[in-house]
Amino acid sequence: MENNEIQSVLMNALSLQEVHVSGDGSHFQVIAVGELFDGMSRVKKQQTVYGPLMEYIADNRIHAVSIKAYTPAEWARDRKLNGF
């Protein structure tokens, strides 16, 4: 699976302002930014992002995924820590 495919799946499934995906074809890192994460715990944020990806994880198109999810305010504060 390609990085842009994951980005497209997440943008279509969730109301996100930004999605950044990096990876090597089976192991991916996802940074998702959206207002929908406001008030959610870190675990709930990750579960929200995992949801649209589960079919790709189940059929091994995605072997491993690391997720960081932020509200726009959190992203404005932390984006430099993530190399943006």
From Swiss-Prot:
One of its GO terms (biological process) is cell redox homeostasis. Keywords: Stress response. Transmembrane segments: none annotated. Gene3D superfamilies: BolA-like. Disruption phenotype: Deletion mutants grow faster and have higher viabilities in rich media, but have lower viabilities than the wild type in the late stationary phase. GO terms for molecular function: 2 iron, 2 sulfur cluster binding. The keyword Translocase does not apply. GO terms for cellular component: cytosol; iron-sulfur cluster assembly complex. Induction: Induced by acidic stress during exponential phase. InterPro entries: BolA (IPR002634), BolA-like_sf (IPR036065), BolA/IbaG_stress_morph_reg (IPR050961). It holds the Pfam family BolA. Coiled coil: none annotated. Involved in cell resistance against acid stress. Belongs to the BolA/IbaG family. PANTHER family: ACID STRESS PROTEIN IBAG, BOLA TRANSCRIPTION REGULATOR. This is Acid stress protein IbaG. The lineage of its organism: Bacteria, Pseudomonadati, Pseudomonadota, Gammaproteobacteria, Enterobacterales. The gene is ibaG.
